[in-house]
Amino acid sequence: MKFITQINEIKNKVSGEILFNESLSKYSWFNLGGLAKVIFKPKNLNELSIFLKNIQEENKVKVLGAGSNTLIRDGGFDGVIIKFGKTFSHVSLLKENILISGASALDKKVSNFALNNALTGFEFLSCIPGTIGGAIKMNSGCYGEDISKILISVQVMDLSGNIKVIPSSQIKFHYRGSDLDDDLIFLSATFAGKT
């Protein structure tokens, strides 16, 4: 009950949607999964930070991307699921060969954006379901390419609501993973393409 009271207090500080006992099956490509105690859909970075700063540390927090590579147990999730919306799915050019993408942008969207802007190196993303956040989390790849080869940096938020940027040179990538802390929430990333 204390948890629900705490979430209701946070509701007064944010305008993003907060759902209680929501079925996770509608967020999974497999249409499986039990209930999440809470799903929070922040409207922006500030709301996400406020939410995390006001939630107690003992509560479990996980981000759910596209749900394309996620199997959710029937018992659900006894904690908070963060679900990003369109605000976190932007894709744009920073420079001629530097692309920035929100963590919830679909991999295919990023690949298509690169193609439309005459950037190479992103082709492999076109056949990977999921989001850029998930791609970084698991070092997605195929056909001899992976996300670590094009990543410049990733912007993250810790569970205390603090933001930092981690250069790819400080990340140890391996096959379908990295040494990034599991508690980090990916917000956006910059990538280098070839013109």
Positions of PLM-derived features:
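Anion-binding (especially nucleotide phosphate/pyrophosphate-binding) glycine-rich loop
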Residues: F3-I132
